[in-house]
Amino acid sequence: MQDFLQAYSWINMRFLLTGLWVTIEVSVISIIFSFIIGSILGVIRYMKVKYLSAIVGFIIDMIRNLPLLLIIFFTYFALPRIGVHFNVTVSTIVAMTIFESAMLAEIVRSGIKAVPKGQLEGALSNGLNFYQALWHILLPQAYKKMIPPIVSQFVSLIKDTSLATIIMLPEVTFRAQTIYAQKPMEIIPMFLMLAILYFILNFTISQIGSYIDRRMVS
Amino acid sequence: MWTLFTSHASEFFTGFGWTILSSVIALIGSTILGLGFALLQIVPNRFANIVGKIYIEVVRNIPLLVITMFFYVVVAKVLNLNGFVSGTIGLTLYTSAFIAETIRAGINSVDSGQYEGARSNGLSWWQAMRYVVLPQAIRLVIPPLGNQFVNLIKNSSVLAFVAGLDLMYQANMISQLTFDTFGPYIIVAIFYLILTLPLSYYMRYLENKTDR
Amino acid sequence: MQIKKVAGLTLGFLAAGLFVSGVATSPVQAETAAKNQTYDRIKKTHTMNWGVKGDTKLMGLTNIRTGKLEGFDIDMAKAITKRIDPKAKPELTQITSGTRVPMLLNGNIDAIIATMTITPERKKVVDFSEPYFNAGQALMVMKKSDVKSIKDLNHKGARILGVQGSNSIENVKKFAPKAKVVALPDYATALTALESGQGDALTTDNSILYGMAVDNHNVKVVGGNFTTEPYGVAVDKADPKLTKAINKAIDEMKADGSYDKLAKKWFNDVPGMNWKEVTE
């Protein structure tokens, strides 16, 4: 029991929380970028622009069907070979953004598609052009319905930052491993703390998400 | 690229085999577990509902890597689990929470009048589920379930962290032997796509069909 | 009909993917970097990026209290940097055995000083400085284990833990061909795996193993060294000037006693280790 509590000394906790901050930082930046890029790609794919939509669709399908771990390796080890250099943090953000944008694009595309056809036709016959209809009629309704899948995608993103331990991103999982490798007695308390930290972070986000969802629907 | 593939073909195919095996075991295991936890959430018993809810929320909010590592380095002290087994258990538990949520959502979206009708015709709760609600729910959840299976195959790459012999592990080993950081990953990417792309497209086809 | 369409789409995409990747690889192999870019950049920007270990006690380890890296390799990196350019600041990037060579070749780091053995295979892809440390591969087992040497593990069913990208796992194939190698991403995971019974022994260089055994009383180093592992600083082949400068720095350090001082600082109090032996 004493060992157990000792594992939560201020020194260990500070080390872990610094890692949690890295997790949050990387996640938030990736969420912002992938939300913007994913939305644009999703709209392009929905619009069926000649060639462009097909190419975008092709890229999205490839990325969506590959493991994120593989994409992390790619951005960290393959991109520098064509002259693009990133440090670990930026690499992770780029990899997360590439992967999550593709995932979000698919959510956005099917979200817009789910808006009843009459809405678009109505808007067009009322004199709006396609982009106005998209911006004022289709997207607002689509996003309202998309809140749950988007939020769960963001939760996935936060969890997936743990995969970046493979390229030594000093986030919270990596730091927990560092601690229990040096102090084997602290392995169980470290796993418990990891579970608690991730749970609090992700559960809070899910709850906020469903709160917004309820507000929007009513 | 071709010579890299032919000179390490046995490693790549070994990895492919382990990835498939792990995915299939986890797919079966997580479907059974997921169905169980979905039912646990809707049975008319408050305690069971809470147990189901807690399991799903806890497992869903913790990274797969953390669950897998837990089995590999903590549980293995008591039970003898190697990397492949730990990884597959982690994958099964993690995916089961998502499948449970998917199935529960499917059951909820079946018109409640159906269930009430069945009950008022004298069917028990279980009979109403078994013969009226579940058959309809399953048809609804097949596309999202298929997407979960695609995620499962992709997530099986977590085995690489625990020497699970899968595709990703083999790619790492070959890459470190040959100092080539590009070729091995492109080759395993193709192997992954062989598994995931057909499933993805088939699910999209089913989705489009039900939409119409 | 639909199955055919799905199969067709998949095949089409795979073919296109192969084509794209083929195109993407070709210019990469043709690329030749300008000579001595790294050396000139260090002189200009006064920073030198080192790839170092963060999970091996004595050589390179993250201090949980301060969050900083410390060890013999780290001190060497700092000292060499100062001797190459007195104004330069060393930047330390944590790497693993598996990631260090690609990171060097990709230009993410300027040099590797991370328990890296000079081997003929590696010499084909990177340049090495002269050896600055003499390690040897050994075995670590749990205290209660009766494994005494690598020979005891040369049987079917034996599992030997190692780290991906280390040449120790290649050596196992020579010394215990019947044993199964379990290769993990880093030493932190490998040590934890040994304690959890994921293998019968952990093999790597004695310098790393002794470091692990300092704080951990459940494990022991056994059997003595069965290989010699001279460590060198690795540099991109395109930077011969940097390799030369590093060699000069190491020579100076050996001549003025600062090298011995560092070796003594880190290895003098380690049970089972003789600092004079490893620095010969």
Q: Where do the language-model regions lie?
A:
Chain C
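Ligand-binding clefts/hinges and TM-proximal coupling segments of bilobed small-molecule sensing domains
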Residues: 31-36, 43, 167-181, 221-225, ...
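Extracytoplasmic small-molecule ligand-binding "clamshell" domains
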Residues: 32-112
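Short loop->beta-strand "edge-of-pocket" segments that line small-molecule binding or catalytic clefts
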Residues: 48-52, 70, 151-165
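Extended ligand-binding regions for polar small-molecule ligands
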Residues: 74, 83, 151, 166, ...
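Acidic, polar ligand-binding/catalytic clefts
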Residues: 78, 89-152
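Short helix-initiation/N-cap motifs at beta->coil->alpha
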Residues: 90-102, 147-148, 182-192, 196, ...
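A ligand-binding cleft/hinge motif common to bilobed small-molecule-binding domains
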Residues: 99, 116-124, 170-174, 193-228
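Periplasmic-binding protein-like
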Residues: 134-141, 206, 210-247, 269-280
